[in-house]
Regions:
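Sec-dependent signal peptide recognition
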Residues: 1-8
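Cleavable N-terminal signal peptides
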Residues: 5, 16-17
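N-terminal signal peptide c-region/cleavage motif recognized by signal peptidases
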Residues: 10-15
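Active-site-proximal helix/loop segments of hydrolytic enzymes
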Residues: 20-22, 47-225
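Short glycine-rich His-centered loop
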Residues: 21-41
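Short, flexible micro-motifs
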Residues: 31, 38, 44, 96, ...
């Protein structure tokens, strides 16, 4: 009996070590290419990192294991990000949105709201879309509104609509979405080149509410798996 346990225990330990985090939270952009600059002059990377850290904190309090990707600001390769996420059950990339340059500075209220993005080429495309719906539902429940301008060929880029009501669009060729080995979504938290939207999202209470809503949506995604 002793020898049987001696053989079993190392195998059990190996199984524990092999288990990875539940969620990979990817921080969009990096220090050398920080993404859009907000209306108040803050880089998108800094906004993405702050929100991802807050979401990770909420998930951690609920016992969800999170792997933050790109926190050091040095992750230039998109495919390296999805490779680093291997072993996780869900990939979510955190971003903040912009508009086409000709519409800046933003004075039009249509350029506001969150959006979610999926790749229909992802190996778990149906689960990715279902997850995006979960996050959108939690955001809407918390009082955030989806944006729709990305579908417009003039005001946006004519992107394919996956779910209009929830602000979900397709970017099939985006590397962080179509090379992920798990369901994958990209979250645009809001249009930060819009001064009113940026100020609203950076309000501490609103910021906490958004982080909690995103975390709740991601928990719903995990529950469905």
């Amino acid at each position: 009996m002793w020898h049987r346990f001696a053989l079993l225990l190392p195998l059990q330990a190996c199984a524990c070590l092999a288990a990875g985090p539940d969620v990979a939270l990817d921080i969009g952009h990096y220090l050398e290419e920080p993404g859009v600059i907000s209306a108040s002059g803050v880089s998108e990377f800094e906004l993405n990192r702050k929100l991802a850290q807050a979401v990770a904190g909420v998930l951690g309090e609920d016992g969800v294991q999170v792997r933050l990707i790109g926190e050091d600001g040095l992750h230039a390769s998109l495919t390296a990000r999805t490779r680093e996420a291997r072993g996780t059950r869900l990939f979510a990339s955190i971003h903040h949105d912009s508009t086409r340059a000709k519409f800046q500075p933003v004075r039009d209220a249509r350029f506001a709201g969150f959006s979610l993005w999926v790749s229909r080429q992802n190996r778990a495309a149906a689960a990715s879309i279902a997850c995006a719906r979960h996050v959108a539902d939690r955001m809407i429940e918390a009082g955030f509104a989806p944006s729709h301008y990305h579908a417009d060929p003039v005001f946006g880029e004519g992107r394919p609509v996956v779910d209009w009501q929830r602000g979900i669009f397709a970017r099939d060729a985006l590397a962080v979405l179509n090379t992920a080995n798990s369901p994958a979504i990209l979250i645009e938290a809001g249009v930060v080149v819009n001064p009113a939207e940026e100020a609203h999202l950076r309000d501490p209470a609103v910021f906490r509410s958004q982080a909690a809503a995103i975390a709740a949506g991601l928990r719903d995604c995990l529950r469905d798996q």
